[in-house]
């Protein structure tokens, strides 16, 4: 994603990313929502594995640890979260990002989303969390995720929503697109998936974010990064408010939001 930057700038960029992802309200709230979705997916996977092992006899009783792959793992914040659900590992194109993963003791290797360095049907669960929108060929990346996911396994996808919400952060992050729910669902189906659930997320801050981006476009104000906009006094509160959406999302699909979350299954 930052391959064209000088080495010192890449290291600085990923150092900022590592710090921001650990504490910024948006990432904290997103992880709370993702954990809720992951718990549901993992429960289904573990129930299926227990049933299969029970049929195989006492020698295979119990639930084996799930293998999980985080595509585009970056500096490892999501990989740390995923590790509580099984044997998680990551893949990323950036050596600098991978170095942060290794410093945290996380398993990660270099590779492209469009040509993942894994055998067919290796993982019970694969994730791409704000990654697919970076790809020149998003369907190719999703097909690779489908390939390395075991039959009966799941992929959890999180992407930004609506091109008319395009902002400075999209430019900084080298995004190619912001999706509608229909668009990302269509691409996942083209890759071979069955969609179990698709919903918008971050309804809580939809209006303020839309208003802020319209204001910046009208005034020409361009912050170095939207993550640098100072909300330090409210950071903890914002994280809790965003994360609280997980309660509503247990039973409701939001009709609109800043992001989209999709649970896709390999049948």
Can you name each region flagged by the protein language model?
Residues 1-47, 65-121, 125-129, 142, ...:
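Conserved N-terminal segment of class I S-adenosyl-L-methionine
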Residues 15-19, 155-177, 181-189:
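Short, glycine-/aromatic-enriched active-site segment of Class I SAM-dependent methyltransferases
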Residues 48-60:
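Short Gly/Ser/Thr- and charged-rich N-terminal loops/segments
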Residues 129-132, 158:
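Residues lining the SAM
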Residues 139-154:
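A short glycine-rich, Lys/Arg-flanked "PGG" loop and its adjoining helix->strand segment in the class I
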Residues 193-203:
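Conserved S-adenosyl-L-methionine
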Residues 205-239:
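C-terminal helical/coil "lid" or tail adjacent to the Rossmann-like core of SAM-dependent
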Residues 213-217, 255-267:
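Core SAM-dependent methyltransferase catalytic element
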